[in-house]
From Swiss-Prot:
This is Pescadillo homolog. Residues 503-528, 543-580 have a biased composition (Acidic residues). Belongs to the pescadillo family. The keyword Ligase does not apply. Keywords: Coiled coil, Nucleus, Ribosome biogenesis, rRNA processing. Component of the NOP7 complex, composed of erb1, nop7 and ytm1. The complex is held together by erb1, which interacts with nop7 via its N-terminal domain and with ytm1 via a high-affinity interaction between the seven-bladed beta-propeller domains of the 2 proteins. The NOP7 complex associates with the 66S pre-ribosome. InterPro entries: BRCT_dom (IPR001357), BRCT_dom_sf (IPR036420), PES (IPR010613). Residues 573-679 form a coiled coil.
Length: 679
């Protein structure tokens, strides 16, 4: 494999002054070459095996490219644009050198070539599905730049373009109800949408004050942003036209200046402008392309055929309603505890899309308004209100509005969350609506939840219990919806008893009792031992032995106890069997004595500790038998497979130990919580 650099010379991060690129077959500079490679999707391959031979003995940092990639770039039309740009830059430089700033600005305005990437988008993505598959990185990059502050490296024009494109994409997701899952992580908020059968996952950073460091190459990132903005513009146009909407949507600059964000865009259908009922926007009204096509056909038909067409449409709608009514989701339940768990069928997209449709939400000032508004509207909610200081576009800014059913808060209540009682009289003498101001008062009949309730509800596809997410409550764990727990791993969603192996609960209980007894009685027992009558402390009438004598005694005791300890370990199974047999024999003997004397046998009820010990012994015996059987099976394997199995068992044992530690920690926390509630 012959490998060639674009300049017939090694490419280094900081090329020396004497390295000339004019002899390059592409006739462009190194920054332009890297920019062109990003546009065309050409990336350096891995280092070749014969790196020393290809580098001709050079040890400098070198980037290699395939010869076919360089030949592929020779026919790129952008090369002419780069050369024109270089020529105009020289003219502008000469004008500035002569002090003719007016001529320089005129040259920059009139002669500077515009680089268009439309042909590259069509070349890299022959089909629309290909563009959707490559949309993850584009959305993550554009959402990142949309939340960055403007600076010398990032012009405000680029940030405004990223904000416009990303909000247009969010409007499509809201209108089509394509959002499926979301997750709050340390990096930001992950979103997953399903568009035309393709799962698209992107990351949106939290809205904090971003501080960019000096070690970031904004020139490379700006090149990616330039390409991704063109790509997302193509994708948005195709998505909008596929559902019968006009692209680009109308933009209200005044609303955007007032913090409207999504509210600054107004969607319109191709036939007539649509104004939604909530927040005055058209994202609430969906346009079905199939229904629009049928309506267009009906309008072109003669009057005689209109009745038949209308009847056909009504019949089709009735059949669809009947199919939706008969839809039932089958649940696959495991037949045995160790059986494979089949993936459960998901609820219909229509049900999930209207998850929050019946409710009216109000967002408190401390909650993330942008992400909550996007998620709530994407899942059917048409009425979202917030305080006026958060921006324009709210359904209502009155927190005391009686139409509000849910209020999302992110701080505990003050004054014990007392209901709103300051009822005032109106001018006509009637009672006015009470004024509710969280966290000082609560509105009767309104549900107060924390923001995590929204994320957990959409990830599970159903409305969860609101009392588990009440203000100030300990929230359940927020888990990633894309990571499914494997068999044997700890699952925080399941109850502890459902994932504990046999005998583990009893062992945890005994450990907890021993720790409690030691903590409570430890000091008292020690004082009783030290202060007992007749005790002699060190220095009171006795000699202290030398360290050497103590060491020798300890060594002798260790030598004497060593073999005995080994024998105890080896004969533990036999002792457990003997103890069980001895207990049965003693019980039988007591029964015979009671029968001979005519007395009633007193049945001694075992204590909780004895029951736990019995269950634990049975579990240990069963586990020991399984391990012995496994060892016998491993003896039949070859040495190679035995080593492979050993590595597998190492990973399984490590995972089991981690799961056991987590279960032990959870058992300790639940026990402490139960004790606190009992008190």
């Amino acid at each position: 494999m012959h490998i060639l650099t674009p300049t017939q010379a090694p490419l280094v991060p900081n090329p020396p002054h004497e390295l000339m690129y004019t002899s390059s077959p592409l006739q462009i500079s190194l920054p332009d070459f890297r920019r062109l490679c990003i546009f065309k999707g050409i990336y350096p391959p891995r280092e070749p095996r014969n790196k020393k031979k290809v580098s001709k003995g050079s040890t400098a940092a070198t980037t290699f490219y395939y010869t076919k990639d360089i030949q592929y770039l020779l026919h790129e039309p952008l090369l002419a644009k780069f050369r024109e740009h270089k020529a105009v830059a020289k003219k502008i430089g000469r004008a500035l050198g002569r002090g003719e700033s007016g001529d320089a600005s005129r040259l920059e305005k009139n002669l500077m070539p515009k680089v268009k990437l439309d042909h590259i988008i069509k070349e890299r993505y022959p089909t629309f599905v290909d563009a959707l598959r490559d949309l993850d990185d584009a959305l993550s990059m554009l959402f990142l730049f949309a939340n960055l502050p403007s600076s010398d490296h990032i012009p405000a024009k680029t940030i405004a373009l990223c904000q416009r494109l990303t909000r247009e994409f969010e409007h499509y997701v809201i209108t089509s109800h394509s959002l499926r899952k979301s997750f709050l992580s340390i990096k930001g908020i992950y979103y997953q949408a399903t568009i035309q059968g393709q799962d698209i996952l992107w990351l949106v950073p939290y809205r904090f004050v971003q501080r960019t460091g000096g070690d970031i190459d904004f020139r490379i990132m700006g090149t990616f942003v330039e390409f991704y903005t063109t790509l997302l513009g193509f994708v948005n146009y195709r998505l909008y036209t596929s559902i019968g909407l006009v692209y680009p949507p109308k933009f209200n600059a005044r609303s955007d200046e007032q913090g409207g964000e999504l509210a600054a865009f107004q969607l319109e259908g191709k036939a007539t402008a649509t104004n939604g009922a909530s927040n005055g926007h058209a994202e609430d009204a969906e346009i079905n392309p199939e229904a629009q096509a049928i309506a267009d056909r009906i309008g072109a038909m003669p009057d005689v055929e209109e009745e038949e067409a209308t009847t056909a449409v009504a019949k089709t709608g009735a059949e669809d309603d009947e199919e939706e009514a008969n839809e039932e989701i089958d649940k696959f339940e495991p037949t045995a505890p160790d059986a494979d768990i089949l993936p459960q069928p998901q609820a219909s997209s229509a049900e999930v899309a209207s998850l929050f449709a019946p409710f009216t939400f109000y967002l408190s000032r401390e909650t993330p308004r942008g992400s909550l508004e996007f998620i709530l509207k994407a899942f059917g909610c048409k009425r979202v209100g917030w305080d006026g200081v958060l921006g324009d576009g709210a359904f209502t800014t009155n927190e005391s509005d009686p139409a509000i059913t849910h209020q999302i808060v992110d701080r505990p209540a003050l004054s014990n969350g007392a209901p709103a009682s300051n009822v005032q009289e109106t001018e006509n003498g009637g009672a006015a609506a009470p004024k509710a101001q969280w966290p000082y008062s609560m509105m009767p009949g309104r549900t107060y939840v924390q923001p995590q309730w929204v994320w957990d509800s959409i990830n599970q596809g159903k409305l969860l219990r609101a009392d588990h997410y009440s203000p100030g409550a300990d929230l359940p764990p927020h888990l990633s919806p894309w990571v499914k727990p494997k068999k044997g791993e700890y699952d925080p969603n399941l109850p502890l008893a459902a994932q504990q192996p046999e005998g583990e609960a009893e062992a945890f209980e005994d450990e907890g009792d021993e720790e409690t007894a030691f903590d409570v009685d430890g000091d008292e027992d020690m004082e009783a031992i030290v202060d007992r009558e007749g005790s002699v402390e060190v220095g009171e009438g006795m000699d202290v032995a030398d360290d050497s004598e103590d060491d020798s005694d300890d060594d002798e005791s260790d030598e004497e106890d060593g073999p005995a300890g080994d024998e105890d370990d080896l004969d533990s199974d036999a002792e457990s069997d003997i103890s069980e047999g001895e207990a049965a024999r003693l019980q039988h003997q007591r029964e015979l004595e009671a029968e001979a004397t005519g007395k009633k046998l007193e049945v001694k009820k075992p204590t909780r500790k004895e029951e736990n010990a019995t269950i634990r012994k049975k579990a240990e015996k069963k586990k020991r038998a399984e391990e012995e059987e496994r060892e016998r099976q491993k003896m039949m394997l070859s040495n190679k497979k035995r080593k492979l199995l050993k590595r597998i068992e190492y990973g399984e044992n490590k995972r089991d130990n981690e799961s056991e530690n987590l279960r032990r920690k959870r058992a300790r926390v639940e026990k402490a919580k139960a004790a606190a509630e009992a008190v």
